[in-house]
């Protein structure tokens, strides 16, 4: 929705595609077409039929490789190759491409059937190619790994899981922006998760309190090194990182904006509208939005969540008086769609700290 709204403000004609017209983005796009985003031949025909100038996704790892492949085939603008997008969409390929020489990489093991874990415990068990925090488990023993294995693998399109050494320390989200291989923007936020749901986001706090001057320098080096290894030279990057004794370890990385509206928080906090920057850079080659960068003002984004399958009930959520913006994904009485399948986002608010 955020991307479509930005393009509408820029005067672009917007086309949205999805399997169903059941999201807020579909309602505000100039045109909506019911197309499976994985159906590349149908999408290609649609793009050619309507003479569409660019195809892009700002928040979906599943859509990124498709958008990049179509852009390569049709000569449309794109930031990264389809290979790079595919590497970032497959955690096993990402770990392999980063190599052991990357200081931010984590010991890992890929499995397509139950095996003895070699990375030690505790460890993180997750699908090799899923998004939305689906099928992620913290396991403390071989027995726990085996009991959770099938549940994690069911979310993998390739039928594989990855087991990674558990990194003990605070978790941060990192939004960056590259221009011709230079890291021109970097902002870290504390990533506060729900204690009862491993990895599921509750709050983002800007600037990250877990990042001091020493950590910031290491963080920049790690992000830039990882981008070079996987082939990201231009456009947005998003990382989930954990700091263990001040050292940054990469949990996830992807060549897109995050899916948590952090562009909105960062515009209010640091002056740069990353969503606008993405499309001005992609469509027109302009990056002057970066000149608006200023010292970061403390802010937070807080998500409201409900169990999937429940009915939206706005009245149960408290909106602070000092909130500067808020949004609900559902109307009262609408059913919450399963995304992570455990505790799904139904809205958010942003406030100054």
Predicted regions and their residues:
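ATP-binding N-terminal substructure of ATP-dependent carboxylate-amine bond-forming enzymes
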Residues: 1-84, 288, 296, 334-335, ...
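Conserved ATP-binding module of the ATP-grasp superfamily
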Residues: 104-106, 122-125, 136-173, 188-189, ...
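A conserved helix-loop-beta module that forms one wall/lid of the active-site cleft
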Residues: 72-135, 140-142
């Amino acid at each position: 929705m955020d991307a479509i709204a930005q393009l509408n403000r820029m005067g672009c004609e917007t086309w949205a595609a999805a399997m169903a017209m059941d999201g807020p983005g579909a309602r505000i796009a100039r045109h909506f077409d019911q197309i499976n985003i994985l159906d590349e031949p149908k999408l290609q025909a649609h793009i050619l039929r309507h003479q569409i100038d660019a195809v892009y996704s700002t928040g979906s790892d599943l859509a990124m490789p498709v958008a990049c492949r179509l852009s390569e085939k049709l000569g449309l603008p794109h930031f990264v190759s389809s290979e790079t997008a595919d590497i970032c969409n497959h955690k096993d390929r990402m770990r392999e491409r980063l190599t052991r020489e990357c200081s931010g990489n984590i010991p890992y093991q890929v499995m397509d059937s139950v095996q003895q874990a070699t990375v030690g415990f505790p460890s993180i068990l997750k699908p090799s190619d899923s998004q939305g925090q689906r099928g992620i488990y913290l396991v403390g023993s071989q027995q726990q790994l085996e009991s959770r294995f099938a549940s994690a693998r069911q979310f993998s399109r390739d039928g594989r899981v990855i087991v990674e050494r558990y990194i003990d320390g605070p978790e941060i989200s990192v939004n960056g922006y590259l221009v011709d291989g230079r890291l021109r923007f970097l902002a870290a936020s504390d990533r506060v998760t729900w204690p009862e749901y491993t990895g599921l986001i509750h709050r983002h706090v800007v600037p990250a309190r877990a990042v001091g001057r020493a950590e910031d320098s290491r963080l920049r080096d790690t992000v830039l090194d990882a981008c070079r290894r996987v082939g990201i030279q231009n456009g947005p990057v998003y990382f989930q990182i954990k700091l263990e004794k001040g050292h940054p370890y990469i949990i996830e990385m992807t060549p897109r904006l995050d899916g948590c509206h952090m562009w909105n928080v960062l515009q209010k906090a640091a002056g740069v509208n990353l969503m606008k920057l993405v499309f001005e850079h992609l469509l027109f080659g302009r990056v002057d939005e970066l000149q608006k960068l200023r010292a970061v003002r403390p802010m937070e984004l807080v998500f409201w969540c409900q169990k999937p399958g429940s009915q939206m009930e706005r009245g149960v959520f408290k909106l602070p008086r000092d909130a500067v913006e808020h949004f609900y994904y559902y109307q009262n009485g609408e059913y919450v769609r399963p995304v992570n399948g455990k505790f799904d986002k139904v809205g958010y608010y942003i406030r100054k700290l």
